[in-house]
A protein has these predicted regions:
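Eukaryote-biased RCC1-like beta-propeller repeat architecture
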Residues: 4-12, 17-392
């Protein structure tokens, strides 16, 4: 059988060289012949939120920042949680940070202090529309579609390995433009462009950045028109304009929807199992993925040990076929941070299942869906930080 050149990944190239597909493992063959995604065209726009209060529902690592409303963050349109440090974009386009100065995440605002309990403005930023946390770096998307970063210099500089491991001043990520949003992540950055393409940089051991091998900024090849992009720890998962879900990277946790598990690929493959559902948004956590369809149903797959199934079980198994999460009302948004899945319904109520809110002082005893108490409707969640809707 002749295999198109664009289908051949580094892993499969090795086994093909050793003797054709019969020399490949069953997992490699399964990924090699997985269904391709349908061609589509998309023109996603930047997510917009009303200026509201940022509210902390979990603990900030190594910080004395109390849970509840973050002082000075009552006009916020985007938030990001890097574990030790929080960042927010204000309605006027400025950015401020609070927490611990790990890897320069306070952007030089702490004046040598190890942490701050009051937000401090990040210098040199006046036109931000959103912020994301990728490992120990913050990446902001500007109104003109460019991206700047600070913190861990490997991510903040676009996958370049410089002389200093830390960047304390925001600077442009070269080669990145026309971006509408950047996905939260850990080892790699994934940025959604206004033409439905995806840019990536960072660690590429699982081929999450596609071809060629390397760590620097590139447009990931053969991605159909994407409307939503997420990082599920070693695999990228997208929703396309046709309502399909596609994924690439590592399949050890079944995130590519292929059996037997294992293998990896740098080409997007279609994740089947959604029936007639039209998926409009995706989210990625620690080795699991979520998909929201147009009817408000949430689907999940991947490693199940954290209770992502929402049925009360926490068996350490892997689900490669998406399954609806029971016990939830129709949702309008889904998100995931580390081992915690989240959802927001039409009234703004925040739902969580699995192990519960990130870094909560009281981990959930029951992994079934439950409402998270909040002083007002939620617009979005990142880590342990909720952006509330404006009050009446």
């Amino acid at each position: 059988m002749r295999i198109p050149l664009r289908v051949v990944t580094v892993t499969t190239a090795v086994c093909l060289a050793l003797g054709g597909t019969t020399a490949c493992s069953p997992a490699d063959r399964a990924v090699l012949f997985a269904s391709a995604c349908s061609d589509s065209t998309a023109f996603p726009t930047a997510p917009r939120h009303e200026p509201g209060q940022a509210h902390l529902i979990g603990q900030v690592i190594r910080s004395g920042l109390p849970m509840g409303p973050v002082p000075g963050w009552d006009d916020v349109v985007s938030v990001a949680d890097a574990g030790t440090t929080l960042a927010a974009v204000h309605a006027g386009g400025t950015v401020s940070v609070v927490g611990v100065d790990h890897d320069g995440l306070l952007a030089g605002t702490a004046g040598g202090a190890g942490q701050t309990l009051l937000p401090r403005r990040v210098p040199g930023v006046s036109d931000a529309i959103s912020v994301a946390a990728v490992g120990s770096a913050f990446l902001i998307t500007h109104a003109d579609g460019t991206v700047s970063g600070w913190g861990d210099s490997f991510i903040a500089s676009g996958g370049l390995r410089g002389d200093s491991p830390v960047r304390t001043t925001p600077a442009a990520v070269q080669g990145v433009d026309e971006v509408v949003s950047v996905a939260d992540g850990s080892l790699s950055a994934l940025a959604l462009r206004s033409d439905g393409g995806v840019l990536g940089w960072g660690v590429n051991l699982t081929e999450i950045l596609g071809e060629p091998p390397g760590t620097t900024v590139r447009r990931i090849r053969d991605v159909p028109g994407a409307v939503s992009v997420s990082d599920a720890s070693g695999a990228a998962v997208i929703a396309t304009a046709t309502g399909e879900v596609c994924a690439w990277g590592n399949n050890v946790h079944g995130l590519l929807g292929v059996e037997p598990r294992g293998g990896q690929t740098n080409r997007p493959v279609r994740v089947d199992g959604f029936g007639d559902a039209e998926v409009v948004q995706v989210a990625g956590g620690q080795h699991f993925a979520l998909a929201l369809d147009s009817a408000g149903t949430v689907w999940t797959w991947g490693r199940t040990v954290t209770g992502i199934l929402g049925d009360g079980t926490t068996d350490d198994t892997v689900l490669s076929s998406p399954r609806p999460v029971p016990g939830l009302p129709p949702l309008r948004w889904v998100g995931a941070s580390e081992s915690s899945p989240y959802g927001i319904d039409g009234a703004g109520a925040l739902w969580s299942w699995g192990r519960g809110p990130v870094r909560s002082p009281e981990p959930a005893r029951d992994t079934r869906p439950r409402r998270v108490p909040l002083p007002g409707p939620a617009q979005t969640v990142t880590g342990a930080l909720v952006l509330l809707a404006p009050g009446d």
